[in-house]
Amino acid sequence: MKAASSNAEQSSHDKILDAAEILFAKRGYAGVGLSELAEVVGLGKSSLFHHFENKAQLYAAVAARILGRIEERLVRSLAKGGDPIVRLERWLDELIDLLADHPTYARLLLRSLFEDDDLPGDTPEEQEAHRAIAGMMASVGALVREGMAVGLFRAANVQHLLLTLVGLTVFPFASGEFGAEVLGKDIFDPAEVRRRKRELRDLLRFGLVANKGR
């Protein structure tokens, strides 16, 4: 009986996160009310508070879940081995696949960057989100430095490069109508996803990789 109750609890928890992810990605932190969210999930507002104390905690939990999934892909990708070029390209390919498979991810992640000021900063969920970001930036930064040390990557400012990689991967999948207008196609179309991978690989090969690493 306890197991069934625990499973039901987890199911409700996940349903709340799933619905919140869609709404927050579409309208942002300020544009979503907990009463509306409870109605979408089919719960009373008091039941919603049983899972999350407030909207800030819920928002941080949604972001932390997305970042955790991205981090999981990064760890798995880097563990497959290969030189720094191969590992970086593989990781970026997997990140693009993940963003393409989950249209809410990129938009919510970009929103969270400038909506962070609305959050108190002290919830476990926020701390977990910040830990995931710091961990991923450290891992990719170490990979880039390794490539520079062995002469595969040209000398570059690693911090600026990390910001560039975030922009190159995340922004296109959050660009909405603007992106569709620029491309003339839907970025989530499988053919465009493949093209995005090729374009990013070429940018790396001709912008970051040293001549002898090409």
Language-model features and meaning:
Residues 61, 75-107, 133, 158-162, ...:
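Hydrophobic alpha-helical connector segments
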Residues 86, 128-132, 148-166:
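All-alpha amphipathic helical-bundle segments outside canonical DNA-binding/catalytic cores
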Residues 1-2, 97, 101, 134, ...:
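C-terminal peripheral helix-coil segments that are non-catalytic and often amphipathic
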